[in-house]
Amino acid sequence: MTTENGTVSTKIDAGIATVTFMHPKSNSLPGPLLAELARVIRELGSNPEVRVVSLGSEGKGAFCAGASFAELQSIADEATGKKFFMGFATLILAMIRCPKFIVTRVHGKTVGGGVGIVAASDYVLATSAASVRLSELAV
């Protein structure tokens, strides 16, 4: 998938499915990108060729900046708010329910909803540049 909402790419080799996401705004995750990641995880979970899912993001900066700030600012009513917050819930549930091991590769800052992705992983490999922050705790 490639759109103005970012990209999700998948490659399967020797039983390992490598899933990589990218968004130009520090790998933030707008709704369509979250939905695509959840769909891909569910699909790989039922693929008999796949034994392990390796999840990561592109770039050398942030692993994941969390939710799309523009989408958060655009919430005008309860229905829109519910849809916004269900995006991460849907992805995290897909990861938790996936019968394959999910190994997440973290290479930089991980903020907000990105922390949920890390927590939903079976294993996490982090570089020395990785850091985790829940911005909600700064309030």
What kind of region is each of these model predictions?
Residues 1-56, 93:
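Conserved CoA-thioester-binding segment of acyl-CoA-metabolizing enzymes
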Residues 91, 95, 105, 111-139:
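CoA-thioester-processing core
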Residues 57-91, 110:
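Glycine- (often His-adjacent) and acidic-residue-rich active-site loop
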Residues 21-25, 73-76, 106:
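Short, histidine-centered active-site or binding-site loop motifs used for metal coordination
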Residues 19, 55, 68, 117-119:
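Hydrophobic/aromatic residues within transmembrane alpha-helices
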